[in-house]
């Protein structure tokens, strides 16, 4: 009860907001999946993934106010790592006490070597995470170490906790021979932890884990973090922040990364370039996905209503990202989003496919900001040529006369536009061959080469459009690849690539 004297003196105790709804949903999920056997292709459904995601985020959000004399001088997030703070966390206490402590009672009966069902798996991993204890019952960080200045000690303890959460999930996957069960390891367990070290220590040190067919999503999660550091400095294209925990990315961010770390597309996102990003937020009624697009650098915020658990998606696809083409497959549509059908999940970067875009929808379209070529047929402009230097050089001869390049006409029929494209390409090819021998115009040659490549991209875009509108595409739709010279993508082809 609140003390009336304290209220009179204006002293109001801090009250933690506990999202009981996520606890109720978690309890229902555990009951629903408690007897569901884990088989080779069993996965956690989208609805259940989002329930788990909410539980971990709500636990983080409910951390108690930290004592001034009980903070880490190293900046470690002790509010989620030590029993001193976790036992004060109102969400954690409510979770343990919920439904006459039924969840905690079930958790106490489990150990990592006897779990065979989905509900057991989820309850065990989630309770290990929010309890701040390793599988052997030891705390992530002892209370006496909260104010420790021993950087090596604290970093080693957090790294061990992060690694054993992932190792435990792989151990269960290997024993059951399962491919797709996956929860991950939350962002705060990666404090000063090198993803590459964790990846190699787990996979290089365990012969049984060498079969990448087992625990595919876990492998994909750790492999991604092994090649992409948490803080990329000048190379970062995106930064996510939740409760002060930041993470930067230079690649497309698949759903299993945001889900596994505990981030959401509804968090604070900062863009460091003007290249477009597609932020996938939910499923639609065409077996596809809805996304919002952002083009300008700075803080971006998804303002759409947060979808229900069975529809919500967390994934970001980078467009026009030419910084690391070898990792472009992370942005392939069927790699960046986890399919809700277990058997259709794609977790192999090398074998990922990029089909199905015609089922997706951009949902933040504005009348003055439409990139589709139905509404904006104006082609990419050709730069004006620079003036030729006025002085003659050795072996100078008169500049050859170039053929006139016909202007595109957007109102023509598709067949006429294709013939016109071919005519323009032939004209440009003739001009390129003529001017290529003219030593003064190497810059003009470069511009012609660039424009020919751009026209090739538009030809692919046009072919895709014809196939999609006629619904006649018995083979995979052609992909618009990044420009061979500068890696750019015409605005009309953004939704078809990366």
UniProtKB/Swiss-Prot annotation:
Q: What is its main location?
A: virion
Which keywords annotate this record?
Disulfide bond, Membrane, Phosphoprotein, Virion
Cystine bridges: 43-342
InterPro entries referenced in this protein's UniProt entry, alphabetically: Poxvirus_A26L
Pfam families this protein is in? Pox_A30L_A26L
- Highest taxon of source: Viruses
State where composition is biased (Basic and acidic residues).
Answer: 355-367
Q: Name one GO cellular component term.
A: virion membrane
What does the subunit section of this Swiss-Prot or TrEMBL entry state? Interacts with proteins OPG094 and OPG143. Interacts with OPG154. Interacts with OPG152. Interacts with host laminin.
| Similarity field | Belongs to the orthopoxvirus OPG153 protein family.
Q: What does this protein do?
A: Envelop protein that mediates acid-dependent endocytosis into host cells. Plays an important role in endocytic entry of the virus by acting as an acid-sensitive membrane fusion suppressor. Low pH in host endosomes triggers conformational changes to allow de-repression of viral fusion complex activity and membrane fusion within vesicles. Also plays a role in bridging the mature virion with structural protein OPG152.
Protein's recorded name: Envelop protein OPG153
The organism named in the record is Variola virus (isolate Human/India/Ind3/1967)
């Amino acid at each position: 009860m609140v003390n009336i004297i304290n209220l009179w003196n204006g002293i109001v105790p801090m009250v933690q907001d506990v999202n009981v709804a996520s606890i109720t949903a978690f309890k229902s999920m555990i009951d629903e999946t408690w007897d569901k056997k884990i088989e080779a292709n069993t996965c956690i459904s989208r609805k259940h993934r989002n329930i788990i995601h909410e539980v971990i985020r709500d636990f983080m959000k409910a951390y108690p106010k930290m004592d001034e004399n009980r903070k880490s001088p190293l900046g470690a997030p002790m509010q989620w790592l030590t029993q001193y703070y976790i036992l004060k966390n109102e969400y954690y206490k409510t979770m343990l006490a919920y439904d006459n402590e039924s969840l905690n009672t079930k958790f106490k009966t489990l150990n990592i070597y006897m779990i065979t069902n989905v509900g057991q798996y989820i309850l065990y991993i989630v309770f290990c995470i929010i309890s701040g204890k390793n599988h052997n019952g030891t705390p992530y960080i002892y209370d006496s170490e909260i104010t420790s200045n021993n950087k090596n000690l604290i970093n080693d303890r957090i790294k061990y906790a992060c690694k054993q959460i992932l190792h435990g999930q792989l151990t269960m996957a290997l024993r059951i021979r399962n491919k797709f069960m996956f929860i991950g390891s939350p962002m705060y367990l990666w404090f000063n932890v090198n993803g590459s070290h964790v990846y190699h220590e787990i996979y290089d040190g365990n012969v049984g884990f060498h079969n990448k067919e087992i625990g595919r999503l876990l492998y994909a999660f750790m492999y991604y973090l092994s090649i992409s550091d948490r803080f990329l400095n000048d190379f970062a294209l995106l930064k996510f922040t939740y409760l002060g925990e930041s993470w930067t990315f230079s690649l497309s961010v698949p759903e299993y990364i945001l889900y596994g770390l505990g981030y959401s597309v509804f968090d604070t996102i900062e863009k460091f370039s003007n290249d477009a990003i597609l932020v996938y937020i939910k499923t639609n009624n065409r077996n596809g996905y809805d996304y919002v697009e952002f083009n300008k650098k700075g803080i971006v915020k998804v303002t759409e209503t947060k979808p229900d658990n069975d529809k919500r998606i967390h994934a970001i696809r980078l467009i026009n990202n030419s910084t690391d083409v070898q990792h472009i497959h992370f942005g392939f549509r069927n790699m960046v989003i986890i399919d809700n059908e277990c058997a259709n999940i794609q977790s192999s970067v090398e074998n990922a496919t990029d089909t199905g875009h015609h089922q997706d929808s951009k949902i933040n379209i504005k009348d003055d900001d439409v990139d589709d070529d139905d509404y904006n047929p104006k082609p990419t402009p050709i730069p004006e040529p620079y003036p030729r230097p006025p002085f003659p050089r050795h072996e100078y001869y008169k500049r050859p006369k170039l053929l006139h390049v016909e202007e595109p006409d957007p109102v023509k029929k598709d067949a006429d536009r294709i013939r016109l494209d071919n005519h323009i390409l032939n004209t440009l090819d003739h001009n390129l061959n003529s001017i290529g021998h003219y030593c003064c115009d190497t810059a003009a040659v470069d511009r012609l080469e660039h424009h020919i490549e751009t026209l090739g991209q538009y030809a692919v875009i046009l072919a895709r459009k014809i196939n999609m509108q006629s619904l006649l595409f018995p083979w995979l739709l052609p992909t618009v690849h990044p420009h061979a010279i500068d890696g750019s993508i015409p605005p009309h082809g953004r939704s078809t690539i990366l």
